[in-house]
From Swiss-Prot:
Sequence ranges of Polar residues compositional bias: 282-298
Organism: Neisseria gonorrhoeae (strain ATCC 700825 / FA 1090)
Subcellular localization: Cell outer membrane
The keyword Membrane appears for this protein: yes
Membrane disposition: Lipid-anchor
Domain of life of the organism encoding this protein: Bacteria
Residue ranges of the region described as Disordered: 282-313
Residues lipid-modified (N-palmitoyl cysteine): C15
Any GO BP: cell adhesion
Protein name listed in UniProt: Adhesin MafA 2/3
Length: 313
């Protein structure tokens, strides 16, 4: 029971998880990060339900949240050296005796038949000698334990790769093709498909307990998509979300190891806010219906030539 009571404060005193910025060596993604980003994005895109677009020609519009930024994190890996280091000092009693010498001063006064003699004794204002005696033994004892990690955090700057957006767009086009849905230029499409990528990035965290430590890197992809028929302006696919995260984790004991390395891919929590519950206003008419074509605000209606091309005429 005593051992358990001692272990509980030892384990809980330094509980905490520090979340930092993923490091890019030389501005390039390291292999594990590439694997995680690809896995989460592939899983999210694969989850998209495109059955309502079977046999249609779709124009695809992908919008990705910007991921450029920078941050600093400094400090080394946790060490328990300072937590249990102790010292004991034993100094003997010390006594010092000072010797102050005395000196006499004599003054003689004479006046005719009268005379007088005055004698005084004084001490010097500084000791002429000092004697120090120590009583007892002097000793010093110390004990400590130092466990260092395999490396330190350094200041890092997050360098965004603009090709990530192109990679994600190509993944979406690949899934469309494999599902049998043709992706065409906007002028030949009968369906507009909008994909908004809200989350597409990585997060690194470190868990530090006295006995257990872990390094965790996660990649998350969260997107929302919907599809609109160009002729009728009706939703073929109501706004839906797809969210997945992949994780790489190394587990240590006293920062020795790792004794366990794991990779997982699983469904993530959905968007904090989505558009699945939005409905048109009751007074919306066909004349002021929204236009879903990009850069088409001045000419919301589709021309006859475009309609003829869609029908293959």
């Amino acid at each position: 029971m005593k051992t358990l009571l001692l272990l509980i404060p030892l384990v809980l005193t330094a509980c905490g998880t520090l979340t930092g910025i993923p490091a890019h060596g030389g501005g390039k993604r390291f292999a594990v990060e590439q694997e995680l980003v690809a896995a989460s994005s592939r899983a999210a895109v694969k989850e998209m339900d495109l059955s309502a677009l079977k046999g249609r020609k779709a124009a695809l519009y992908v919008s990705v949240m910007g991921d450029q930024g920078s941050g600093n994190i400094s400090g080394g890996r946790y060490s328990i050296d300072a937590l249990i280091r102790g010292g004991y000092h034993n100094n003997p009693d010390s006594a010092t005796r000072y010797s102050y010498p005395a000196y006499d001063t004599t003054a003689t006064t004479k006046s005719d038949a009268l005379s007088g003699v005055t004698t005084s004794t004084s001490l010097l204002n500084a000791p002429a000698a000092a004697l120090t005696k120590n009583n007892g033994r002097k000793g010093e004892r110390s004990a400590g334990l130092s466990v260092n990690g395999t490396g330190d955090y350094r200041n890092e700057t997050l360098l965004a790769n603009p090709r990530d957006v192109s990679f994600l767009t190509n993944l979406i086009q690949t899934v469309f093709y494999l599902r049998g849905i043709e992706v065409v230029p906007p002028e030949y499409a009968d369906t507009d498909v909008f994909v908004t990528v809200d989350v597409f990035g990585t997060v690194r965290s470190r868990t530090e307990l006295h006995l257990y430590n872990a390094e965790t890197l996660k990649a998350q992809t969260k997107l929302e998509y919907f599809a609109v028929d160009r002729d009728s302006r009706k939703l073929l696919i109501a706004p839906k979300t797809a969210a997945y995260e992949s994780q790489y984790q190394e587990q240590y004991a006293l920062w020795m190891g790792p004794y366990s390395v794991g990779k997982t891919v699983k469904a993530s929590d959905r968007l904090m806010v989505d558009f699945s519950d939005i409905t048109p206003y009751g007074d919306t008419t066909a004349q002021n219906r929204p236009d879903f074509k990009q850069n088409n605000g001045k000419n919301p209606d589709v021309g006859n030539e475009v309609i003829r091309r869609r029908k293959g005429g």
